[in-house]
């Protein structure tokens, strides 16, 4: 890099149904959370079950789930060097309602006890 020009990466996002958002260029200093905000804003309105917040999304690149607080530079590795166009896979977490989350908490594993009977 010379002359203060910041490195940029060209990224497209592959949605669960196989369609794409992008490609678009992002500065190397962009965080994964920033990418997710961009995805939420660009999510096609005609698609059902879209994300409401960045926490509803997971980004996967080169088989790794990317952490929200990491920058693109920090996500680079020998496997994922962001050279050329990079495709990241988007996974949308199914929204859970309060009723569903209460059911999960309410279900406790039953104690398994042995019973002996003398005949």
Curated annotation (Swiss-Prot):
Q: Which residues form the propeptide?
A: 117-119
> What SUPFAM superfamilies does UniProt report for this protein, alphabetically?
Ubiquitin-like (SSF54236)
Protein's cellular compartments: Cell membrane
Residue ranges of every copy of the Ubiquitin-like domain listed in the record: 9-75
Concerning InterPro entries, the annotation shows: MUB, Ubiquitin-like_dom, Ubiquitin-like_domsf, UBL3-like, UBL3-like_ubiquitin_dom
Q: Which CDD domains does the UniProt entry name for this protein?
A: Ubl_MUBs_plant (cd01814)
Q: Which Pfam families match?
A: Rad60-SLD_2
- Protein name in the entry: Membrane-anchored ubiquitin-fold protein 1
Taxonomy, top ranks, is: Eukaryota, Viridiplantae, Streptophyta, Embryophyta, Tracheophyta
């Amino acid at each position: 890099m010379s002359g203060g020009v910041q490195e940029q990466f060209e990224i497209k996002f592959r949605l669960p149904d196989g369609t794409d958002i992008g490609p678009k260029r992002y500065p190397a200093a962009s965080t994964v959370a920033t990418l997710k905000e961009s995805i939420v804003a660009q999510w096609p309105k005609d698609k059902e079950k879209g994300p409401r917040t960045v926490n509803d999304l997971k980004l996967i690149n080169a088989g790794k789930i990317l952490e929200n607080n990491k920058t693109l530079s920090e996500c680079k590795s020998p496997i994922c060097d962001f050279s050329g166009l990079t495709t990241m896979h988007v996974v949308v977490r199914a929204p859970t309602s309060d009723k569903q989350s209460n059911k999960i908490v309410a279900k406790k594993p039953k104690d398994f006890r042995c019973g002996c009977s003398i005949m």
